[in-house]
């Protein structure tokens, strides 16, 4: 086989095509089908496609007149099966569009197909929807495998679970009963077990492992964002009220000492092995209960805390005792403070200087310091205060920040660096940036939403260049499929099936 001939249905902005391009597959686009005028503009710009290749409304296509092709890609509109779209299924016209996909397979009999849809269809109508779909693929001559894949495992910080169905024409491979991983009991494996009873034509596709969450949300955020994306202080305050306050750390036991021998037990041990006065606790935990009596032969000490030693990182050139020349790291604890605090006798701490907000680079008042270090000495001769850089603020995904009441069940705020909420066409999610409770909350930008679907910056710029508005850019991202997930599927499909057939 020379070039892989591809037909695309329900094309959107062409995630399947972007994935094939990204992994270097030489393919010929024989046609696509899309009815949204803005998506068509973006699609043609991104893929350098002639609009004459658009067959338009899939329900009006004469399938017999379609050109020949090897691979059919697409996912029929998912709103009718999704939780966000209220799950009307085949009762919704959009749900019945699935059968246009089946009719295309039946008439043209391409070698392969890749189909995508929402997780909700697996159990929709008590499993009958998936049963009908799987039986339909079998009836038109395809062996299938299916899997539930989450975008967060494909180098995209978005929690997006979708079902992917791969089909290979039955004359090209032998039937192979599905192997369901032992001990697996999720919704997809249950669905597969149910389908096996229907004698679905099947094979075992090698799916990518889902065990490593790659990129963090902070890695796809734009550095400079227009103020229009930020919520007002009033809205921000109301949202922050919905955050559960961080819990204090528990009392953490780390070891014990023998009062007579003064040794620290570094082995695995338990607090019950030591008397109360001999127990050592982590200083990062909360304090133990204070009592009014002496315990453990240690006078009035009720508990002991393990602390890190001062960390000396250098010397400065001063006259006098060695102790006053030492410079300490802010990562350790302070050395013992003495009453002789003048004449350079105070402890010196290294604080990272990261820049100056004065264009000339001069002036102490304009200096900016890293928040991971300690504050420089505060003085009273300037009223503008010290500028602190926050290099690693919390980045917390926020569900529909512009809505006072959230429309979906579940959390309003995720924890720092968790994957973003699922991008869709209805909800616009956001991020809280800062440290509790001093967050600034904003919406994700259109570019960030495209990045969450793993589209290249160049793809986004091409859509912008043909005049696509922000509202349409959001919609197009929400309607699309995560490109990196499709890349992983195509790599296996091409390597194991397409290339082997060509040899």
Swiss-Prot record:
Domain SAM-dependent MTase C5-type positions = 4-500
The keyword Lyase is annotated on this UniProt entry: no
Extract the CDD domains matched here.
Answer: Cyt_C5_DNA_methylase
Database matches in InterPro entries = C5-MTase (IPR050750), C5_DNA_meth_AS (IPR018117), C5_MeTfrase (IPR001525), C5_meth_CS (IPR031303), SAM-dependent_MTases_sf (IPR029063)
Q: Which GO terms describe its biological process?
A: methylation; symbiont-mediated evasion of host restriction-modification system; symbiont-mediated suppression of host innate immune response
Active site located where?
78
Give the reaction(s) catalysed.
a 2'-deoxycytidine in DNA + S-adenosyl-L-methionine = a 5-methyl-2'-deoxycytidine in DNA + S-adenosyl-L-homocysteine + H(+)
The EC designation for this entry is: 2.1.1.37
Give the keywords, sorted: DNA-binding, Host-virus interaction, Inhibition of host innate immune response by virus, Methyltransferase, Restriction-modification system evasion by virus, S-adenosyl-L-methionine, Transferase, Viral immunoevasion
Q: Which GO terms describe its molecular function?
A: DNA (cytosine-5-)-methyltransferase activity; DNA binding
Q: What does this protein do?
A: A methyltransferase that methylates C-? within the sequences 5'-GGCC-3' and 5'-GAGCTC-3'. Modification confers resistance against restriction enzymes that recognize these sequences.
Instruction: Give the family, as the similarity comment puts it.
Output: Belongs to the class I-like SAM-binding methyltransferase superfamily. C5-methyltransferase family.
PANTHER family noted in UniProt: TRNA (CYTOSINE(38)-C(5))-METHYLTRANSFERASE
Q: What is this protein's name? A: Orphan methyltransferase M.Rho11sI
């Amino acid at each position: 086989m020379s070039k892989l001939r591809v037909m695309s249905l329900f094309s959107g902005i062409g995630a399947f095509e972007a994935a094939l391009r990204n992994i270097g597959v030489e393919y010929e686009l024989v046609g696509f089908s899309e009815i949204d005028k803005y998506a068509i503009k973006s699609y043609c710009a991104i893929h350098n496609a002639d609009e004459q290749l658009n067959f338009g409304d899939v329900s009006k296509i004469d399938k017999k007149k379609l050109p020949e092709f090897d691979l059919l890609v697409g996912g029929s509109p998912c709103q009718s099966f999704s939780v966000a779209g209220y799950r009307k299924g085949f009762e919704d016209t959009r749900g019945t569009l699935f059968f246009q996909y089946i009719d295309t397979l039946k008439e043209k009999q391409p070698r392969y197909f890749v189909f995508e849809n929402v997780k909700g269809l697996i159990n929709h109508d008590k499993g009958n929807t998936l049963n009908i779909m799987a039986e339909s693929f079998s009836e038109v001559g395809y062996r299938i495998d299916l899997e539930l894949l989450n975008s967060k495992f494909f180098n995209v910080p978005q929690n997006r679970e979708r079902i992917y169905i791969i089909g290979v024409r039955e004359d090209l491979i032998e039937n192979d009963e599905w192997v369901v991983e032992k001990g697996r009991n999720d919704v997809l494996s249950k669905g597969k077990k149910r389908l096996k009873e229907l004698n679905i034509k099947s094979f075992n596709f090698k799916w990518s492992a889902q065990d490593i969450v790659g990129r963090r949300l902070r890695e796809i955020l734009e550095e400079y964002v227009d103020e229009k994306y930020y919520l007002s202080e009033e809205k921000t305050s109301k949202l922050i009220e919905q955050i559960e306050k961080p819990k204090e750390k528990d009392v953490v036991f780390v070891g014990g000492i023998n009062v007579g021998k003064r040794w620290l037990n570094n082995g695995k041990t338990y607090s019950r092995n030591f008397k109360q006065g001999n127990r050592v606790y982590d200083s990062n935990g909360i304090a133990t209960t204070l009592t009014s009596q002496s315990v453990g032969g240690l006078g009035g000490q009720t508990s002991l805390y393990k602390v890190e030693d001062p960390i000396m990182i250098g010397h400065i050139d001063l006259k006098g005792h060695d102790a006053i020349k030492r410079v300490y790291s802010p990562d350790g604890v302070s050395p013992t403070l003495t009453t002789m605090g003048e004449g350079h006798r105070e402890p010196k701490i290294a604080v990272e200087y990261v820049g100056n907000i004065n264009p000339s680079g001069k002036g102490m008042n304009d200096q900016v310091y890293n928040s991971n270090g300690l504050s420089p000495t505060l003085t009273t001769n300037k009223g503008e205060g010290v500028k602190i850089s926050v290099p690693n603020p919390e980045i917390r995904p926020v569900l529909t920040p512009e809505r006072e009441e959230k429309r979906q069940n579940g959390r309003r705020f995720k924890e720092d660096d968790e994957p973003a909420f699922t991008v869709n066409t209805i909800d616009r999610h956001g991020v809280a940036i800062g440290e509790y409770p001093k967050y600034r909350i904003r919406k994700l930008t259109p570019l960030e939403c495209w990045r969450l679907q793993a589209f290249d910056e160049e793809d986004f710029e091409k859509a912008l260049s043909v005049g696509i508005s922000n509202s349409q850019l959001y919609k197009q991202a929400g309607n699309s499929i995560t490109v990196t997930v499709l890349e992983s599927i195509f790599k296996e499909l091409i390597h194991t099936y397409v290339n082997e057939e060509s040899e």
